[in-house]
Amino acid sequence: MITIPSHEFTDLLNEISKKWQEEWSKNRIFEADPKDQKKFFTTVAFPYPNSPFHLGHGRTYVTGDVYARFMRMKGYNVLFPMGFHFTGTPIITMADDVAKGDKDLLDIFQNIYEIPADVIPKLSDPLFMANYFKEDIKAAMREIGLSIDWRREFTTIDPQFSAFIVWQFSKLQKKGYVVKDTHPVGWCPVHNLPVGMHDTKGDMEPEIGEYVVIFFESKMGALAAATLRPETIFGAVAVWVNPKATYTVAEIWGKKVIVSEKAAEKLKFQTDVKVLEKVSGSDLLKIVAINPITGKEIPILPADFVDPTTATGVVMSVPAHAPFDYFYLKKAKVGIEPIPVVAVEGQGDAPAKDLVESSHPKNDADLKKLTEQLYRLEFNKGLMRSDILRLVKDELRAELSVVAGKQVPEARKMVTDILIQRKAGTKMLEIMNKPVYCRCGNEVVVKILQDQWFLDYGNPEWKAKAKKLLDSMRVIPEETRKDFEYALDWLQKRACARTRGLGTPLPWDKKWIIESLSDSTIYMAYYTLSHKIKEFGLHPSQLTEETWDYIMLGEGDVKAISERNKIGVDALQELRRHFTYWYPLDLRHSGPDLIPNHLSFFIFNHAGIFPENLWPRGVAVNGFILYEGKKMSKSLRNIVPLRKAIRTYGADVIRIALSSLVDMSSDANFTEAGARAIADNLKRFYELMQMQDGSTIDGTPEKWLRSKLHRLVRDVTPLMESMRFREVINELLFNLSSYINEYLEMVRSESREYNRDVIREVVETWTKLMAPFAPHLTEEMWHQLGHNTFLSLESWPTPDNSKINDQIELEHEYHKLLIEDIRAILNVYKGKPSSVLLYVHDGSLNQVVKSALDVLNSGGTMKDFMQKNTPKSKEEARVLQRIMQYVTEMPETVKKLIYSNVNEMEVTRKGVPLLRYKLNLEIEVLAYTQEVKQKLNKDALPYRPAILVK
């Protein structure tokens, strides 16, 4: 076998990749058109071209391509297109940062992405940036081997695509799904624009949640304490403020209140705020507050853990049910006792106290975990204590009596309603996953937006359709379905237009531009005919609402539409034919961060516009990529550009690492050591292809290897179908390599050469199975094996079940077990061994062993076994006990051999050549007899021979 040095193999991989990318492009093998063949239409989210691709981007695209290539080999006519998302604020904001001379960004562009110095200033022009990075991303996609039909490429600012978006929004408006309303949104206070996931740094979706604000009256005004657990107000024994923060006395919510300075600034975006004066947190410690439910005076205490930027910056202290509160009250030694409010069966009166004192938290992070644990427990299992009414002031007791004994969720709503009715509380909105930053660098706040256009995802009719679509859709992995269900439930009104950014104007209110997560929900439909729109030279003015109604929905008179829009009937029918052939979309690939936004919007918009037969059929979600165990980030300077990684390791190595290191839903950790291990295994198979000599002997080793190969084909095919790529690669790259090593040892043990035909069969089959993962190397190997077709277009292997031989595989596994047992004895053997004697049982106990296995398999016990096989003597009882102990530890291989009824002596003798070769000792196989037992004082059982080392 020829051995190639590792560094030379990487160079070879890059040469091979370039060669076959050019061949695929030249021969246009991934261009897909309607034909008399079952179709498979798949897409991956098109990228924002505001920076080059890094390793983290690659996983979703490669995973999508692996599956597309697999389906192509399974006989499907596969369409995998790509476009580019120019609209929205990501590109404009990044260009602004270049124009401002953002040092961190310029450093990353120059020193990590290696963008030429003369190009960087030009990136301040948004369109230059978009087009420059579009070409760079396209190059990365080609270099990583994506099997894309590039004829269909478009950008979201192409006028023809804008005409499609106009149609989409006109349909939604007519159905009542686009509304003008007042609603909370994430908001950039600098740009004065709504902010969604793709407008933020790190692509974080601003999650808007609700705090209940409870007014604790004081001589300076009401301390506005924000809480997520208003039902625990009965046990509030103090108010926390941050002594180092600045607070304001202000008129908010129609009364004089005290909130942090930061809170007052944020609340201006939700309600009227009039600041009267500023006070320090330490000044507030000099006054007392009144619990509005109990009427008791309670102290105001200092707490550095109170974040003045979160909610109101004022927190009530409930030490019975808040681990933070109990921990810090105890530390402050103020002598305040917890007051229990919520009861959980099996828990003490003050569960926060019990948790803290049993867990010994070392820091705030530990306290946060305990808090989440207790909050979850009490929310799900807690009941309001009946004795809380003794805490309530007289005038509220009757009104609050309904709360006693209620479950926590119900009590929470009741208490909130009563507080608001009594003007003792209100609600405020907050970014729950704060801090979230706009791409311009400013922190996002919540704004109550008036006269804004929204997609009304809370519309009951629309929501029901979306849920029906999800129910009909395949979700990979299935466990992410619950995340989709939660998102569809949670979504309400969503701002769908901006006054800034690239994009399509709202057709009925052109001062607004449709935002980037709203114009990217049904664009997959546009792929089906984008190349034909170019081919026919259609102008946006021809792509009217009735034109799209005909193409997408089959509505209208084609001749009349043709005449009015000056599009030939044949062209319209051709566009309709292409759309109806490819749609619905079969599979959509994306990341988990897009479930609560893009992927849910994708479901809603398809459900809202298209009939059920055109609803998407599936969605696949994969986890993120870590680099050497850490998230890639600018601050860590560990961003690895995708094109650089390809040059360093080879495209196929990167493809395998990105798609197959872990299960789909898990985050994958890319490491240099892991990449090298993948490269070494690829090299091993490439070198195996060079094994041209060998013999034509076709014996047991060949039958065994063919059996393992065809079993592997049979097993990995359903794994591929369910996108369990980690398990597939484990079989193809690691297990199959082990099988080949075992086969070569088997033939060497027979003092002969390998069979060249079986090696070729293994290599040919492997190239097909690995083609979706390592398309470049396998294409090269396929041609070196003498084929002149494109492997990418070959059929997926089918197993020959007649070649799967369970018995031969079992016998070989048994021989390996014997080797392990002998080695275990040799490890403790004193002296130099020369031979091993194996004394094989005569099989007289086989039926008894089967009986023990039957009892065990049916859930029986030793007692059941003894009743079934009544011993006639103490010796028989001892043997039966040994047998039962034996079968409880018996390997699966031996169990199968026991049931197969083959002759143990024959099976053992077949393994002698391999045992001799592996152990480098003489092996003798002898019959186990009573004389042997008495002479050697050794026991044997079926398939557990007595072993004697000489």
UniProtKB/Swiss-Prot annotation:
- Which NCBIfam families has this protein been placed in? leuS_arch, PRK12300.1
- Which GO BP terms apply? leucyl-tRNA aminoacylation
Q: What is its EC number?
A: 6.1.1.4
Q: Which reaction does it catalyse?
A: tRNA(Leu) + L-leucine + ATP = L-leucyl-tRNA(Leu) + AMP + diphosphate
> Where on this chain does ATP bind?
634
**Gene3D superfamilies associated with the record:** Class I aminoacyl-tRNA synthetases (RS), HUPs, Isoleucyl-tRNA Synthetase, Domain 1, leucyl-tRNA synthetase, Valyl/Leucyl/Isoleucyl-tRNA synthetase, editing domain
What is this protein's name?
A: Leucine--tRNA ligase 2
- Which compartments is it annotated to reside in? Cytoplasm
Disulfide bonds, which pairs?
none
Where does the UniProt entry say this protein principally localizes? Answer: cytoplasm
Q: Which family does it belong to?
A: Belongs to the class-I aminoacyl-tRNA synthetase family.
What keywords would UniProt list here? Aminoacyl-tRNA synthetase, ATP-binding, Cytoplasm, Ligase, Nucleotide-binding, Protein biosynthesis
A GO molecular function assigned to this protein is: leucine-tRNA ligase activity
User: Where is the motif named 'HIGH' region mapped on this chain?
Assistant: 47-57
Name of encoding gene: leuS2
**Motif position, 'KMSKS' region:** 631-635
Q: Cellular component per GO?
A: cytoplasm
